[in-house]
Amino acid sequence: MRKTAILALEDGSYFVGYSFGAEGETGGELVFNTSMTGYQEILTDPSYKGQIVVMTYTQIGNYGVNDEDIESKSVQVNGFVVKEAFFRYSNWRAKKSLDEYLKENNVVGIYGIDTRALVKKIREKGSMKGVISTVEKDPKKLVQKARELPDISEQNLVEEVSAKDIYYWNQGDYDPRRGFLYRENEKPLVAVIDFGVKFNILRRLVSEGAKVVVVPPENAKEAIEKINPDAIFLSNGPGDPERVISGIRLTREYMEKKPIMGICLGCQIIGLALGGKTYKLKFGHHGGNHPVKDLRTGKIEITAQNHNFAIDPESLPEDVEVTHLNLLDNTVEGIKHKHLPIFAVQYHPENSPGPHDSYYLFKEFVKMAQG
């Protein structure tokens, strides 16, 4: 027998559906993702820490869960919302169902609700806080709990997902016949500052020839002074970039000493370090089909995105240029310093899930690191 679950929002509305994954209660900021596939990568993306993800595609879970398509060591989302959850799956790599995977990771999910109506609400009103519960049956109480949740901008989420110790990474891209390809690269040495880095970012750097060392953001300066990398990479991560003071200070310390590249949160940190400002988007960019224009070449890239904040182009100093624009809302998707070896993109060129249009950025960065 299916167990009832309720999703209640801070605006007073609620949706009644069915439970899948773990039972219990969870809360967070609701965002929607437009990807048709890649739910396992989405679930394990540290940038989703503190959020409940709503999938716009209707059928989720039909290819199960495998051991390879993970972007961190555990599921990161606070909750999961889908229209139709598949409890039976079919894929040659699958090891378990999505339902089993969520249970193992203690993630509360809800299915069987009108996700189209929910997404329209988020799109029109903006991201809002919500609570999923299988234990509390009074929607009014759940609405009140949603309203009492802390704002995502008030939380230090990077601290929850970043590495605690330095470690080296040599796992490259995945080959369906041979598995992950490992490489013992020697040069250039790239220090990845881990604000919640996705595994596929590390794999892409290794596959392009870099030797990768992952460094926690706290005390990163001491680590960099010790290992003396050829370049610095600022990773993706959750939350408000203005709260990542350590990353902003680190970028300012080394922006005239080392080549630096940033992705997602790393892009915003670079923007702040260079003198710009950031702001929160109404409902963020989350999905694998966002068109971005490279203003230098005129080419259009289809990109994977997952961010809630953006750089204000009017705030950037004259020596920083905007290199990429989102064609859906004209927000900044890439910046570059005119004189220093620093560039960053707001989207995810490593895909996972998503297209491969922007792989060239890793090649450019590794070449820059080689001097």
Swiss-Prot record:
<dbReference type="Pfam" id="PF00988">
    <property type="entry name" value="CPSase_sm_chain"/>
</dbReference>
<feature type="binding site">
    <location>
        <position position="239"/>
    </location>
    <ligand>
        <name>L-glutamine</name>
    </ligand>
</feature>
<comment type="pathway">
    <text>Pyrimidine metabolism; UMP biosynthesis via de novo pathway; (S)-dihydroorotate from bicarbonate: step 1/3.</text>
</comment>
<feature type="domain" description="Glutamine amidotransferase type-1">
    <location>
        <begin position="189"/>
        <end position="371"/>
    </location>
</feature>
<dbReference type="GO" id="GO:0005951">
    <property type="term" value="C:carbamoyl-phosphate synthase complex"/>
</dbReference>
<dbReference type="InterPro" id="IPR029062">
    <property type="entry name" value="Class_I_gatase-like"/>
</dbReference>
<keyword id="KW-0436">Ligase</keyword>
<dbReference type="GO" id="GO:0006541">
    <property type="term" value="P:glutamine metabolic process"/>
</dbReference>
<dbReference type="InterPro" id="IPR036480">
    <property type="entry name" value="CarbP_synth_ssu_N_sf"/>
</dbReference>
<dbReference type="GO" id="GO:0004359">
    <property type="term" value="F:glutaminase activity"/>
</dbReference>
<comment type="function">
    <text>Small subunit of the glutamine-dependent carbamoyl phosphate synthetase (CPSase). CPSase catalyzes the formation of carbamoyl phosphate from the ammonia moiety of glutamine, carbonate, and phosphate donated by ATP, constituting the first step of 2 biosynthetic pathways, one leading to arginine and/or urea and the other to pyrimidine nucleotides. The small subunit (glutamine amidotransferase) binds and cleaves glutamine to supply the large subunit with the substrate ammonia.</text>
</comment>
<feature type="binding site">
    <location>
        <position position="309"/>
    </location>
    <ligand>
        <name>L-glutamine</name>
    </ligand>
</feature>
<dbReference type="GO" id="GO:0005524">
    <property type="term" value="F:ATP binding"/>
</dbReference>
<feature type="binding site">
    <location>
        <position position="237"/>
    </location>
    <ligand>
        <name>L-glutamine</name>
    </ligand>
</feature>
<comment type="pathway">
    <text>Amino-acid biosynthesis; L-arginine biosynthesis; carbamoyl phosphate from bicarbonate: step 1/1.</text>
</comment>
<dbReference type="GO" id="GO:0005737">
    <property type="term" value="C:cytoplasm"/>
</dbReference>
<protein>
    <recommendedName>
        <fullName>Carbamoyl phosphate synthase small chain</fullName>
        <ecNumber>6.3.5.5</ecNumber>
    </recommendedName>
</protein>
<keyword id="KW-0055">Arginine biosynthesis</keyword>
<feature type="region of interest" description="CPSase">
    <location>
        <begin position="1"/>
        <end position="190"/>
    </location>
</feature>
<feature type="active site">
    <location>
        <position position="348"/>
    </location>
</feature>
<comment type="similarity">
    <text>Belongs to the CarA family.</text>
</comment>
<dbReference type="GO" id="GO:0044205">
    <property type="term" value="P:'de novo' UMP biosynthetic process"/>
</dbReference>
<dbReference type="InterPro" id="IPR002474">
    <property type="entry name" value="CarbamoylP_synth_ssu_N"/>
</dbReference>
<keyword id="KW-0665">Pyrimidine biosynthesis</keyword>
<dbReference type="GO" id="GO:0006207">
    <property type="term" value="P:'de novo' pyrimidine nucleobase biosynthetic process"/>
</dbReference>
<feature type="binding site">
    <location>
        <position position="47"/>
    </location>
    <ligand>
        <name>L-glutamine</name>
    </ligand>
</feature>
<dbReference type="InterPro" id="IPR017926">
    <property type="entry name" value="GATASE"/>
</dbReference>
<feature type="active site" description="Nucleophile">
    <location>
        <position position="264"/>
    </location>
</feature>
<dbReference type="GO" id="GO:0004088">
    <property type="term" value="F:carbamoyl-phosphate synthase (glutamine-hydrolyzing) activity"/>
</dbReference>
<dbReference type="InterPro" id="IPR050472">
    <property type="entry name" value="Anth_synth/Amidotransfase"/>
</dbReference>
<comment type="subunit">
    <text>Composed of two chains; the small (or glutamine) chain promotes the hydrolysis of glutamine to ammonia, which is used by the large (or ammonia) chain to synthesize carbamoyl phosphate. Tetramer of heterodimers (alpha,beta)4.</text>
</comment>
<dbReference type="Pfam" id="PF00117">
    <property type="entry name" value="GATase"/>
</dbReference>
<keyword id="KW-0547">Nucleotide-binding</keyword>
<dbReference type="InterPro" id="IPR006274">
    <property type="entry name" value="CarbamoylP_synth_ssu"/>
</dbReference>
<feature type="binding site">
    <location>
        <position position="268"/>
    </location>
    <ligand>
        <name>L-glutamine</name>
    </ligand>
</feature>
<dbReference type="InterPro" id="IPR035686">
    <property type="entry name" value="CPSase_GATase1"/>
</dbReference>
<keyword id="KW-0067">ATP-binding</keyword>
<feature type="active site">
    <location>
        <position position="350"/>
    </location>
</feature>
<feature type="binding site">
    <location>
        <position position="265"/>
    </location>
    <ligand>
        <name>L-glutamine</name>
    </ligand>
</feature>
<dbReference type="GO" id="GO:0006526">
    <property type="term" value="P:L-arginine biosynthetic process"/>
</dbReference>
<keyword id="KW-0315">Glutamine amidotransferase</keyword>
<keyword id="KW-0028">Amino-acid biosynthesis</keyword>
